[in-house]
Curated annotation (Swiss-Prot):
Pfam families: PGM_PMM_I, PGM_PMM_II, PGM_PMM_III, PGM_PMM_IV. Mg(2+) binds at residues 103, 242, 244, 246. Belongs to the phosphohexose mutase family. The active site is at residue 103. It is an enzyme of class 5 (isomerase). Activated by phosphorylation. This is Phosphoglucosamine mutase. The modification Phosphoserine is found at residue 103. It comes from the Bacteria. The gene is glmM. It comes from Vibrio vulnificus (strain CMCP6). The keyword Plastid does not apply.
Length: 446
């Protein structure tokens, strides 16, 4: 079996709807191939959730047909956050969980990602085995062995109760006014209820999905509307989720953005204070130097993984640690969940706010973020602009200018046709100009 991936990226199979591989015929075959690999003795049951994209209806039907042809039973949850599907996969003792989502991407993209029976992302060897099955012709099981579909009507209620169980029972959110932005995505009918039931005064936004407005000027990838609303409502803080509920960005009462690095720092520091920190914190190559330095001052170990929550997870398991995060808002808390869970992560920060009687603004001041600029350069051509001599020379010049007080990172996105340029350092103006200079060099060589 080849170890070269053709379809699976860092977060499953993803692309533009109607363009290969996100087409009904390919997704049907993907369902069949996955069913062939995942089928074992036992229930042969798969949980299928989706976000609020209009294409989700088409793709879940195609998936179910493929799974049924392989003899697996599909249980639909309807719109459901990615971590909820991971949780339900475990509690239902299903063979696997499948999420139809493109996370933070625009509505016209979609994707398919899988969870194992333990609620974790599939190992590489299983994904490669599924790709190998895709080369074969579809063969249906015998008619009597065909799978059938059912619907789980109380999926949202089950997950709401789970989320609430991760919040300390002796605490309440009764004194907090919170603006909750659900990105018109999968948390729209869940997150507001979680925080309301724990006592908060909740102002909900981004809770009217229409199939095409997911992540559009709302949610974790664009917090401007949330920042404005928090200030207007004189709220204590704001929470922004992405389209599938695995990313969380927060906003303090002054309208300042609090990103995944700061969220992980607050959670780790609170765990240290309680004597419950198990090991250190895993970040990524994109993690701000300010977080690394802040943790170091507390005596908390820190290591970097490759960019992508699956690599953060791998490093956590390797080290035996419990807290990992990306600055984009993926926060993994392995003492509570099996994957990145935005609602659960938010609840841990809120527990720190309530327990310490400090504001989110005060808690986030424990670390100082370095100015960091990220430029995305669209890249759909052949070759690798990162290997171009002109690009290498520009990077060398910038690194010389930054010296030991900054760093540069160039990488290809694992989910979109983009080259990501990140520059970080103490001098904000130098960082901005350096990022633009490198981005232009990349554009010139695409």
């Amino acid at each position: 079996m080849s170890d070269k991936r053709r379809y699976f990226g860092t977060d499953g199979v993803r692309g533009k709807v109607g363009q290969y591989p996100i087409t009904p015929d390919f997704v049907l075959k993907l369902g069949w191939a996955a069913g062939r690999v995942l089928a074992k003795q036992g229930t042969k049951k798969v949980i299928i959730g989706k976000d609020t994209r209009i294409s989700g209806y088409m793709l879940e039907s195609a998936l179910e047909a493929g799974l049924a042809a392989a003899g697996l039973k599909a249980t639909f949850t309807g719109p459901m956050p990615t971590p909820a599907v991971a949780y339900l996969t475990q509690t239902f003792r299903a063979e696997a969980g499948i999420v139809i989502s493109a996370s933070h991407n625009p509505y016209y993209d979609n994707g398919i990602k899988f969870f194992s029976s333990e609620g974790t992302k599939l190992p590489d060897d299983i994904e490669l085995a599924i790709e190998a099955e895709l080369d074969k012709e579809i063969e249906c099981v015998e008619s009597a062995e065909l799978g059938k579909a059912t619907r789980l009507n109380d999926a949202a209620g089950r997950y709401i109760e789970f989320c609430k169980s991760t919040f300390p029972s002796e605490l309440s959110l009764a004194k907090l006014k919170i603006v909750v932005d659900c990105a018109n995505g999968a948390t729209y009918h869940i997150a507001p209820n979680v925080f309301t039931e724990l006592g908060a005064d909740v102002i909900a936004m981004g809770v009217t999905p229409n199939g095409t407005n997911i992540n559009h000027e709302v949610g974790a990838t664009d917090v401007r509307a949330l920042q404005q609303r928090v200030v207007e409502e004189q709220a204590d803080l704001g929470l922004a989720f992405d389209g599938d509920g695995d990313r969380i960005i927060m906003v303090d009462h002054l309208g300042n953005k609090v990103d995944g690095d700061q969220i992980a720092y607050i959670i780790a520091r609170d765990a240290l204070r309680r004597g419950e920190l198990k090991g250190g914190v895993v970040g990524t190559l994109m993690t701000n130097l300010g977080m690394e330095n802040g943790l170091k001052q507390l005596g908390i170990p820190f290591v970097r993984a490759a960019v992508g929550d699956r690599y953060v997870m791998e490093k956590l398991l390797e080290k035996g640690w419990k807290i990992g995060a990306e600055n984009s808002g993926h926060v993994i808390l392995l003492d509570k969940v099996t994957t990145g869970d935005a609602i659960v992560a938010a609840l841990q920060v809120l527990a720190s706010v309530v327990g310490s009687e400090l504001s989110l603004n005060e808690l986030s001041k424990g670390m100082t973020l370095y100015p960091q600029v990220l430029e995305n350069v669209r890249f759909a051509g052949q070759g690798n602009p990162l290997e171009a001599e002109a690009v290498k020379k520009t990077v060398e010049d910038v690194e010389a200018d930054l010296g030991s007080k900054g760093r540069v990172l160039l990488r290809k996105s694992g989910t979109e046709p983009l080259i990501r340029v990140m520059v970080e350092g103490e001098d904000g103006e130098l960082v901005q100009n350096s990022a633009l200079k490198i981005a232009q060099a990349v554009k010139d060589n695409c």
